[in-house]
Amino acid sequence: MGKGRVIFHVDMNSFYASVEMAYDPSLKGKAIAVAGSVKDRRGIVVTSSYEARAKGVRSPIPVWQALRKCPELILIPPNFDRYRSASQKIFSLLEEYTPLVEKVSIDEGYMDVTTTIKKVHPLELAKEIQQRILAEMDLPCSIGIAPNKFLAKMASDMKKPLGITVLRKRDIAEKLWSLPIEEMYGIGRRSVDTYKKYQLHTIGDLAKADPAWLEKKFGINGPRLHCRANGIDERPVDPEAVFHFKSVGNSTTLPEDTTNEGRLTDVLHQLSHSVHVRMKRKHVFCYGVQLTIRYDDRKTITRSRKLEHPIQEKDDIFTVALSLWKQAWNGRPIRLLGVTGYDVIDKKYAYEPLDLFRYEEQIKQATLAETISSIHKRYGKPIVAKGKDLDLFKEVDETKKGTSFDRDFFQHD
């Protein structure tokens, strides 16, 4: 690999399904899918085995549609305790080779093995890690090897299952630039049409575009993606990164202490909206909601609720926050309110028992929210909003953003 960094991206193959097959070997070689709401057939496929994918069963499609494509499909409800346990074992193994391991999600992570490879060739090291995970846990993975995180991520996607791919900077014109723009890590599915509208059909098109023009069209993300497309990514492998987003929270100090229920409900609604937007931007869902109330005498209380299914939508967050507030409020004037989504999980591993009767409605809501969020992100202020949110933007403009590292966010006075 020459001088410089050597980064691995370790990506487990069809992780949930693979864990289920390791737990029950009789499932191996069969078409299986992990899905929510298996019994009533109205759930969504979270992941599927490669045998099921060969029949067209891919996430996220409704269970009924998956069964139509593959009648012999074996449906398994998610067991997140089992998946978390397997994930912990995988990352413990990776940390045997280097302390520089960054957990991206439950089934993928980066390793900086620059020091480790002084003793062993990168390919041999990757083979050893891959074979150990398979032998000790019966779980397949693919590994990308590159001089930075972006190229390592792209490399790990090039050969699945059980692939090992090296991607050097000198190879990107040949191996990367011809790929369609939708295969580039960092470009969301809903953004693809926008890029194509500007004749950016391949990663190479993006790499050759003018950075200033990209910033004008796509905001600060344009030049960043331009660098990635040219193989430039200076981000370090950060073992602490996983702790940065244990929670996503917002709070606001009210203009004056109040007991006005309508006003307080409006504030909770806007805080829930803010948390939703930030969770969406970070591509996470939460398994719990916490409410913070600070009274006029500065006494602060917190109440929280763990959820059976992860949530991200504003209305879902608001419903839980409102319920917590009604249970906790003692009637005294309130000075501050805060809403936090905690125990977060990457959105691709979150599943909802989606009601198919509301499927089209939810898709429309998601598309509208995406459009509004992109405008806010670009211009830095709420120039567009849904009707019932408009006045709230004016009133709750001192919102404070908090994460698990903002230790004084919920400090009790």
Curated annotation (Swiss-Prot):
Pfam families: IMS, IMS_C
Chief location category: cytoplasm
Subcellular location: Cytoplasm
Domain of life, per lineage: Bacteria
Any one GO BP annotation for this protein: SOS response
Record flagged with keyword Metal-binding: yes
Record-linked InterPro entries: DNA/RNA_pol_sf, DNA_pol_Y-fam_lit_finger_sf, DNA_pol_Y-fam_little_finger, DNA_polymerase-Y, DNApol_IV, Rev_trsase/Diguanyl_cyclase, UmuC
Gene Ontology MF, one: DNA-directed DNA polymerase activity
Site keyed Substrate discrimination: positions: Y16
Catalytic residues as annotated in Swiss-Prot or TrEMBL: E108
Reactions this protein catalyses: DNA(n) + a 2'-deoxyribonucleoside 5'-triphosphate = DNA(n+1) + diphosphate
Ligand binding (Mg(2+)): D11, D107
Cofactor binding mode and count: Binds 2 magnesium ions per subunit.
Cofactors demanded by this protein: Mg(2+)
Keyword Magnesium belongs to the record: yes
E.C. number(s) listed in UniProt: 2.7.7.7
Annotated keywords: Cytoplasm, DNA damage, DNA repair, DNA replication, DNA-binding, DNA-directed DNA polymerase, Magnesium, Metal-binding, Mutator protein, Nucleotidyltransferase, Transferase
Entry GO terms, CC: cytosol
Assembly behavior: Monomer.
Family in the record: Belongs to the DNA polymerase type-Y family.
Task performed by this protein: Poorly processive, error-prone DNA polymerase involved in untargeted mutagenesis. Copies undamaged DNA at stalled replication forks, which arise in vivo from mismatched or misaligned primer ends. These misaligned primers can be extended by PolIV. Exhibits no 3'-5' exonuclease (proofreading) activity. May be involved in translesional synthesis, in conjunction with the beta clamp from PolIII.
Designated name of the protein: DNA polymerase IV 1
